[in-house]
Amino acid sequence: MKLIIAIINDQDTENVSDHLTQESFRVTCIASTGSFLRSGRSTLLIGTDEIRVPRAIEILRENTNQPKDPNEHKAIVFVVDVKEFIQV
């Protein structure tokens, strides 16, 4: 199992979340602020099987907009191993 941590612009959150959930990804959204430009961000937590990671990243690429500032990225994405997953 993998955990995808995606930091995206606030304006893209609803669109990205909708597309991910349409393909049965479970998404948790946390409001966050970047330290450099201090503008609105959302951090998405997406738990998924390793085989589905490429599709999740593809959805992120397709549904995020290029920021006006050339120093910004559409998204910052981390993919980390999940040692244990428990649902209570």
What are the functions of these language-model segments?
Residues 1-88:
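Positively charged, small/polar-rich N-terminal and surface patches that mediate targeting and assembly
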